[in-house]
């Protein structure tokens, strides 16, 4: 960990606890700050808050009183999930108090360089692929961010010869000031999180923060097939490395002659890749580009791609019952992810979908229903999904209250050779704490059928 003195004796407000807030508060105390921790949940229900209080921190729970900002606050470190429209953040901004997220702290203390990966879809898969390729290539990666350990915990122990590989959301990237990844990858942009950002434009600009401090000594890995990403790459001063699944890229990554190429050199045959789905070729090209930029050999990259079958909750094969294959794609929290999941199968498919209503309609899914024989909807968006299914002319459309019911109904509507796919196209927070919990409940419900 770097020697950092900028926080000593400063009053710093950590807003929202959870894992990242707990880690940030603990780190700041270690760095000599006077830490004030604030969380909306009452102290009696807040185990982490009680632990921080026991460490000697000033902990205020049960709301976000504006009076906290009268304590000569030098910096606010916010939980990514707390929107900037929250009154305490609006007031902090008016007072010109800097507002950052925990990943910014991680960067400031880390001796190791960062690789940052963002995009609407494919972040987790690309992050895991990158980690595995760097590990196989003996580049000493450590994984942090939305997957793995909280970034500022990892950064405390990361050494100069290591690489911190981070999956970064728009929520996290809105709160960076100095964050400068050695390599920044922007995979794609799809209309999402409008309840948080308001517009696709603002959402895209938040993502583009991954580029804002890069220099000509850094690299920006960019999806040449995504017009929005290409436009936002103008914010990068780094060396641009493009990847594409549709056209040849001489100075980047592409597919030609049924193989993956990087800067004109064949790296791996498509036939050696075990990860299913056409969309995953984009993720592989991005990860491969990062690995090659960091000096990983073709042999190491190929070894990973011959064994890497995917990440949990992302087109995860669950089991086969009476020749019906079940897949858990609970991480599909928006339409684009579900479109890609549906495109991965040619068999008749029974789709389970639904979740938190963020204001979207689902007509964009209609062209992808060509192999969908039945849909079972649940959650807040069930009526909207039913409307889209009716427009698509599906014969079998059902709505149920719970995911357990949805699994039973989906199996009842299936026949020999079908795929039964959970790909919700929505966030999980209307009925579940996380998409992981939703996926686990789906898997449990499937096993009850056996």
Curated annotation (Swiss-Prot):
Localization in the cell: Cytoplasm
GO terms under biological process: cell division; cell wall organization; peptidoglycan biosynthetic process; regulation of cell shape
Highest taxon of source: Bacteria
Pathway(s) served: Cell wall biogenesis; peptidoglycan biosynthesis
Residues that bind ATP: 119-125
Catalytic activity: UDP-N-acetyl-alpha-D-muramoyl-L-alanine + D-glutamate + ATP = UDP-N-acetyl-alpha-D-muramoyl-L-alanyl-D-glutamate + ADP + phosphate + H(+)
SUPFAM superfamilies listed in its UniProt record: MurCD N-terminal domain (SSF51984), MurD-like peptide ligases, catalytic domain (SSF53623), MurD-like peptide ligases, peptide-binding domain (SSF53244)
Enzyme Commission number(s) from the entry: 6.3.2.9
GO molecular function: ATP binding; UDP-N-acetylmuramoylalanine-D-glutamate ligase activity
Record Pfam families: Mur_ligase_C, Mur_ligase_M, MurD-like_N
GO CC annotations on file: cytoplasm
Keywords recorded for this protein, A-Z: ATP-binding, Cell cycle, Cell division, Cell shape, Cell wall biogenesis/degradation, Cytoplasm, Ligase, Nucleotide-binding, Peptidoglycan synthesis
InterPro entries per record: Mur-like_cat_sf (IPR036565), Mur_ligase_C (IPR004101), Mur_ligase_C_dom_sf (IPR036615), Mur_ligase_cen (IPR013221), MurD (IPR005762)
Function: Cell wall formation. Catalyzes the addition of glutamate to the nucleotide precursor UDP-N-acetylmuramoyl-L-alanine (UMA).
Protein family: Belongs to the MurCDEF family.
Stated name of the protein: UDP-N-acetylmuramoylalanine--D-glutamate ligase
Annotated source species: Bacillus cereus (strain AH187)
Gene name of the record: murD
